[in-house]
UniProtKB/Swiss-Prot annotation:
Domain notes: The structure of NLP effectors is remarkably conserved with a high level of conservation of a central region containing the conserved undecapeptide motif AIMYAWYFPKD and heptapeptide motif GHRHDWE.
Subcellular location: Secreted
Renumbered ranges of motif Conserved undecapeptide motif: 129-139
Gene Ontology cellular-component annotations: extracellular region
The protein's name: NLP effector protein 10
Amino acid sequence: MKLPTFLIGFVALLVTSNGSARYVYREDPDDSADPPNPGALHANPILIDVDDVQPFPQPRAITDSQKSALVYKPRLYIKSGCHPYPAVQANGSLSDGLQWKNFLRSPCPGSPKGSQVYSRSDWYEGKWAIMYAWYLPRALDRVTWLVNGHRHYWLWVVVWTDSPDPKTSTLLATSMPGVANNIHKYYPPKSKYVIREKTLKVKSYQNHILFIKHGLELTDRAGDFQDLVTWEQMTDEARAALSTFHRPEHAANPPLQDKRFYEVLEKAYPFDR
């Protein structure tokens, strides 16, 4: 007996949110984000326990782009939900995440090996865009009426400046996902949300009542830094693993992927066109 398409999709969401299926690889080339050396690093990566992923040590910044990413690195305050964890390690092994349960969830206070924030930068519409991305092993994000969260979740902030030169650039604006499927755009951010005109204070929080979602917003409370690694500083294996990772839940997929990166910049762009 052939199941209706909508029922197959519903079952798939239940399995991927709560069961053993944790990721699939993109097979549609129109939806894929190829690794730096196409065809060379597409072997399935190993999934390892969330607490065993070794973060990248923060490398020395060499280029202006890398220096700017360090200068504008936000401080993240965790009001509720999981703390950020490393998503991938140097050999391309990926975090297995944490199973979502509507009730009686285990705590996720951060990895014993340390945390990580990822970054990718480029020019977009005449502005220098610096994306920062944090990986959560699970998060509140309703996918069906019965499942209000899932394994794997990415939060991101885009910092908009006028130049990749950290010595002369100016913070113009910032964008980040809210809890209502919207994007907060601060143009410009108020001074109470910024330390020394460079460092944004960002809050990570959950909304259980109206929107059933995890999001970010600016705050006047300074949080913590995480070790930063930029897209180009990662190993080929790590970039390939992140680039080919795919889940049915949109927020579970790394915003650093080629296609997603520019999609996010387009939606997050805060200036008049």
